[in-house]
Amino acid sequence: MSKRPVSGCGNSLSVGFRAVRAATVLLLVGSLWAAPTTERLMVVTTDVSKPGKAFSPPTAKKPAYYVPVFIGYSELGDVAQHFQRRPPDEPIQRAAVLALAKMHYLPASKEFPPTLTIAIEWGTITPVYLNQTVINAAEIRARVLGSQQDRFGARDAAYRQEMLSLLGRHFLIVSAFAYQRKPTPESPDVLLWRAHASTGHWGHFLEEAIQPLIAVATPAFGRPTKPGVIWRDHTGLVEIGESTVEELGIK
């Protein structure tokens, strides 16, 4: 598969496939690093495609096995003068694998062959201005809201400005595809679901924000979730905007 950044929630996406067996063993060792204690708003949503609705959510008794593909870090848009710095990859990869395991998505092996390929991307996107217009607005919103830019929950009305913000953001995107060894033009990658989590980058480097982003995205893995705003304070996670799980008509 060729490497390509995520955009929206199409039915297919080619990503960079890597040899991951040895890396997977490494990622399963260790634990999450300490999360920052500062309050911040985070937007979470998950798109589920029509093919994705045919897959039953994994359980402890019947987990789903996957091949991980780490698209990794990207800096998109304009150059940010503040709070833009590449974090180390390994702790993020480890945290993502552990988060997926909490939702019963486990790395595949010879004993347990894969049914999924799960691609993980993180980074920072900054607006590009031309004559006071943000010309990469669609790209920013694709990473924040996916395919659900007009599907806010009623309780999220007060946070519409946060969800539609075009200021610079740190983001995490986790995408699940039906597994195949080698996609072709006749048999392209089939997207099943894509989870998005993002937060404004002002005040924190991505290294400080990524673990809370993974934490708030975890319950939304594989579950149709309307865009919702979650507030993290120093005592833990407090849900303010309701991330409503429901059946969505996404093709």
Predicted feature locations:
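Second-shell loop/turn segments in exported
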Residues: 76-89, 104-106, 160-162, 196-204
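Short secondary-structure boundary motifs at beta->alpha junctions and helix caps
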Residues: 155-160, 170-230
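Envelope-exposed proteins and targeting segments
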Residues: 62-64, 103, 114-116, 168-173, ...
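Bacterial N-terminal signal peptides
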Residues: 19-31
